[in-house]
């Protein structure tokens, strides 16, 4: 896909994302955050000088990478780097936007910490299943693009925009941001219980209702348990629960339930998944 191949394009460079569960050996979290910030400087030194960099783009909570939240202190460092060099800080909220993390946008957590992004890219949940995407930015950034330069046949599609407006209405009317946080609280409590009980559950992390469970063969070595996750997906499907994997090693189950899910549905899913973990742990 274009999304997965974008880093291969000329002029696009990848820096390390803070994966604190798998931070470099021997480092404290504070030392690791410094290390990850310096990986940006390494790009400037080895690939492209800072004055030629237009933007730094990151997900507030990494999606395909394994549902890894960006540490706010690290984002503060990025904001400082961007301000020093005139670089735009762009939040890719295609997965994390529209209530998934307990706020309309996950980057609102950044804003509260004083490191607001310059631009937000969003799609997916924006229109409740109707194809729609959007770019949000400050007036001076949007006005810098000449009229007619960016557009497309279906830009401003009336049906999609109407769906997007209705989504915003429903989020506010049904208090879905509050519900997202409640779902997150329930799930984090349950998943952390599993972490305490099952050797195979290595890490639980997330924001709001967007949570990743990382499975390992051993909690000390943190060796990824990708095969276990593959079996878990099949075992759950056989019992009526659809789950999906993610992560660099394919060993993370990503939890991204609809914000309209009921507690009864949540508990039914928990029951199916925990019993599957129990059965597979005995193999």
Question: What annotation goes with each model-predicted range?
Answer:
Residues 1-283:
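Conserved N-terminal phosphate-binding loop of PLP-dependent enzymes in the Aspartate aminotransferase
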């Amino acid at each position: 896909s274009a999304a997965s191949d974008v880093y291969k394009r000329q002029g696009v460079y990848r820096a390390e994302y803070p994966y604190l569960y798998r931070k470099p050996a021997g480092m404290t979290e504070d030392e690791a955050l410094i290390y990850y910030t310096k990986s940006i400087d390494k790009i400037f030194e080895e690939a492209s000088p800072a004055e030629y960099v237009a933007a730094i783009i990151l997900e507030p909570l990494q999606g395909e990478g394994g549902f890894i939240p960006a540490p706010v202190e690290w984002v503060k460092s990025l904001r400082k780097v961007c301000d020093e060099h005139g670089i735009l800080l762009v939040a890719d909220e295609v997965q994390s936007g529209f209530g998934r993390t307990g706020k309309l946008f996950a980057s609102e957590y950044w804003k509260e910490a004083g490191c607001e992004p310059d631009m937000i890219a969003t799609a997916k949940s924006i229109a409740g299943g109707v194809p729609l995407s959007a770019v949000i930015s400050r007036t001076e950034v949007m006005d810098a693009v000449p009229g007619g330069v960016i557009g497309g046949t279906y830009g401003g599609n009336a049906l999609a925009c109407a769906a997007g407006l209705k989504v915003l209405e429903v989020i506010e009317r049904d208090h879905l941001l509050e519900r997202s946080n409640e779902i997150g609280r329930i799930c984090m409590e349950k998943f952390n219980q599993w972490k305490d009980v099952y050797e195979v559950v290595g890490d639980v992390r997330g924001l709001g209702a967007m949570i990743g469970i990382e499975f390992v063969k051993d909690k000390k070595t943190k060796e990824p348990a990708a095969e276990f996750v593959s079996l878990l997906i099949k075992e759950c499907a056989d019992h009526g629960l659809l789950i999906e994997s993610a992560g660099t090693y394919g060993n993370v189950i990503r939890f991204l339930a609809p914000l309209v899910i009921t507690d009864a549905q949540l508990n039914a899913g928990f029951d199916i998944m925990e019993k599957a973990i129990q059965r597979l742990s005995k193999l």
